[in-house]
């Protein structure tokens, strides 16, 4: 099952907490705060402007996005997995290698 | 009797709580929180934009929609059944198989 | 005497409480909450949009309308009868047989 | 002396309390609440829309208007008489015989 | 020294309290509330609308204007005299003989 | 070093308190309240309107401006001097000789 | 790794506190307040106006910007470095030599 988000909404799978350093050392308690990053699962068709035109979103499926500390409260369960529903305006930017 | 919703309003039949697992095991108390999903019964003619044009809604009769935790407070009784009145902006997306 | 509502306002006669079932059995105390339904008595000429055009209302005289629990606070007395003044945006939809 | 109201403002003379019934019976204390009706004394030239055009008001001098319970707080004294300053949006409608 | 108000701002000299009746009788304590009237000293070039056009103000230098009870908090001192800075929207109307 | 303000922002050097009268008499404690006047140091390129056009500001470098009592909270240090950052909408008008 | 900010967002590296004077004298405790200045690392593609056009931002990569005391709360960690996410409207201006 999947979800088709409406308009300027974006479905995001939150990045899992990293509880170990790159070198593999376990950091107990280090993951108390959930990371504000995730992978875009699907995007809406765009934001509807006052003049009726539709502005396509600036993120794409597969993008790794960073979002605000206080975003990510809206969640849905899809096949037992919790996904986030964000608005495009919740997203700060896209991480690039 | 049925209701014809105005403009960007949508009538939704809330999904019933599942109190048993897929395998049929009863989960007592598991349904304390109402599911934020439902089936679209009827949709309005569309949202009226500032320039006077009408934007048709992005959901259709029969769609299974997911909506916010704090939506679904507006209810009406039609032939003894409680239905929800949502705005299109309350809806996160449409579930697809 | 009658009232000609301005713009997007609508005059509604609230449906009387039903204190008996269809079969005629009296339900004492059953009507504690006022029904959020009524019949449209008269409608304004329409909502004025930002571009100056007038959008005719989507309800008509005689329609049975359903409105929000917290609407219906604005009342006027016409010939000794209390009528409601609603905005079109207070109205969820129109009941149809 | 008279006042020329600006734009969408309307000058209204509040209807006097009726402390007797049509049959002439005095109703002591019956007029505790001020009536939300009045006669239009003068109207502004119209509401200025975002596109710069002017929308003439939908009420005229001499109309008997009904307004909200919480409107009518803005008053001016003209030749010793207290008059109300309303916005057109404060007015529910016009009473007609 | 004088002030050139910007856009939709208006400089007003508040009418002095009248502490005597027309017949010259002194009314002690009668002027506790400042009058909400004044003479327009200068007006801005107009309100800028969303479409970029400028709407000239509907009051002119020398007009006697009435304004809201809670307007008139913004003051400036010009050559030792306190003048009011109002927005056009603070003004109810213009008094005419 | 200088600052180029963005859009409708204006950099202002606040007028120094005058602690002596024109005749040179010192007024102790007279300057408790900061004057709401200042000289414009630099102005932004203009306010961007909803239709995308840019509206040039109505004040110029060197103008003496008066601003609201509660404006002037935003300050920056340029070469050890505190300057104010105002929006054009904070400014009441321009003083002229 | 780098971040591509969306629309009117701007990534800024906050200026480090200067704890010594120009002459090299250490000022203990002088840096209690974080400086509201920083260098622009990357800028979004522009602000989307109501008419659907995109307004390019007025700051560029490498600009030294000054921003409000209460901005700069939104941070992201990029390769272990804390960067600020600002909106263009948070920025007062650009410092120039």
UniProtKB/Swiss-Prot annotation, chains A, B, C, D, E, F, G:
GO terms for molecular function: ATP binding; metal ion binding; protein folding chaperone; protein-folding chaperone binding; unfolded protein binding. Disulfide bonds: none annotated. The keyword Cytoplasm applies. One of its GO terms (cellular component) is cytoplasm. It is found in: Cytoplasm. Signal peptide: none annotated. Its main location: cytoplasm. It holds the Pfam family Cpn10. One of its GO terms (biological process) is chaperone cofactor-dependent protein refolding. Together with the chaperonin GroEL, plays an essential role in assisting protein folding. The GroEL-GroES system forms a nano-cage that allows encapsulation of the non-native substrate proteins and provides a physical environment optimized to promote and accelerate protein folding. GroES binds to the apical surface of the GroEL ring, thereby capping the opening of the GroEL channel. Heptamer of 7 subunits arranged in a ring. Interacts with the chaperonin GroEL. This is Co-chaperonin GroES.
């Amino acid at each position: 099952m999947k979800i088709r988000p409406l308009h300027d909404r974006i479905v995001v799978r939150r990045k899992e907490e990293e509880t170990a350093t790159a070198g593999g050392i376990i950091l107990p308690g280090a993951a108390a705060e959930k990371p504000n990053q995730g992978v875009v699962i699907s995007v809406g068709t765009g934001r509807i402007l006052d003049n009726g035109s539709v502005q396509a979103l600036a993120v794409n499926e597969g993008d790794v996005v960073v979002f605000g500390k206080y975003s990510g409260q809206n969640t849905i369960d899809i096949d037992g997995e919790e996904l986030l529903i964000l608005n495009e305006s919740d997203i700060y930017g896209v991480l690039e290698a």
